[in-house]
Amino acid sequence: MKQDGIKRASIDKLKSRFETAYYSEDMVITPLVMFRELDDITALIQGVSIGVTVSGTAKIKINGKMHELRPNTLFIFNENTVVEQVKASIRSSGYMVTYSRQYLNSIHVDTQDLISIYHGFLDDPCVQVEPQEAAYIHDISKLMRSVLCDYAPTANREKI
């Protein structure tokens, strides 16, 4: 897919674009994002974004292919994924965690696991999960925000 003229969405850009529940140099955790507000989202993600749709529906184009986000849809945008919003319902919303390339390079992950996950989401970046699995993902997000709040520097603590 041709990527000329597409804005790159870095961690800093995401921090300024969204209200954040937590952010650092390497990670942004958003509270509920209203997808309808992302009408000019066409961007090339730098890093990896993992999210889950909570309510409503949104039709987005990912690397030129149409996808529909419904409640309990898990989505992963890999490095250099081109994301374009086409249409979103009034109530479409979800949570996202975005990790920077520097952070991903700093952690040690079993290569076999990483490659299998990466290739699994290349062709289909949106996966419908069971309500119980979605609830589990929401609980993990809440736990992350809680733990990060306890350890966050004072400047970030008020953002959590």
Regions found by a protein language model. Name each.
Residues M1-R70:
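Generic protein-terminus/edge-of-domain signal
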Residues K2-Y23, V86-Y151:
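A hydrophobic/aromatic-rich effector-binding and dimerization subdomain
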Residues P31, I50, L74-I76, M96-T98, ...:
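Conserved hydrophobic/aromatic beta-strand scaffold that supports enzyme active sites
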Residues T53-S55, N78, A88:
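A short, compositionally biased micro-patch
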Residues M66-E68, V82, C126:
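Well-ordered beta-strand positions in beta-sheet-rich domains
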Residues M66-N78, L114-H119:
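A short glycine/small-residue-enriched secondary-structure motif
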Residues F75, E79-Q85, L104:
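Histidine-centered metal-chelating micro-motifs
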Residues A155-I160:
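An accessory alpha-helical subdomain
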